[in-house]
A protein has these predicted regions:
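N-terminal nicking endonuclease/strand-transfer module with a His-rich metal-binding environment
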Residues: 1-171
Length: 171
């Protein structure tokens, strides 16, 4: 997916005369030059205590867009920058500013859209821990620490809430 976002592999549905209009909406930290390194940097600086499993989700890719007609209207009214700023603001508020490692506006495809990359780091007790309160065995409770958990960030209830909130926030 990074190859598509960074245009190291050019999809057939792009217009090469508009590729120069694509732009990064989030700057990488110093010493970081691409999305893969930005994800690694976030994982290394998040203060995670647990080992990251080899099959564990380390990043979530999100595409933000509208219908072709809606996006043409936004672009035609000169409100594309405002639309981008509203979406980046929503992403930061929803997933955390530190967890949003990349956002790129693609203008070289038929419909303008944003590709965002989020590292799913959450704080607080595990959802499973809440269920274990009624269990027979009690384990020592640990202080809440940052943890990598895509299941919590992308639960069904969260996805419904995100759809409602992003529509309200970005119109």
């Amino acid at each position: 997916m990074s190859a598509h976002i960074e245009r190291t592999i050019v999809p057939k549905n792009t217009d090469p005369t508009r590729t120069h209009l694509n732009r990064e909406l989030i700057m990488f930290p110093d010493g970081v030059c691409n999305r893969t390194l930005a994800i690694r940097h976030r994982l290394d600086t998040a203060g995670l205590k647990r080992k990251i499993g080899k099959n564990q989700v380390q990043a979530i890719r999100i595409v933000l867009s509208g219908t072709h007609e809606d996006m043409a209207r936004v672009e035609g009214e000169g409100k594309l920058d405002e639309w981008c700023a509203d979406n980046v603001k929503w992403l930061r508020e929803t997933y955390g500013a530190d967890n949003l490692v990349s956002a790129v506006l693609h203008m070289d495809e038929e419909t303008p859209h944003i590709h965002a990359t989020v590292v799913p780091i959450v704080q607080g007790e595990r959802r499973k821990q809440k269920k274990e309160e009624n269990a027979r065995r009690r384990y020592r409770t640990k202080a809440p620490a940052p943890r990598l958990c895509a299941d919590e960030v992308m639960s069904r209830a969260s996805l419904i809430r995100y759809q409602d909130n992003t529509w309200r926030s970005t119109g």
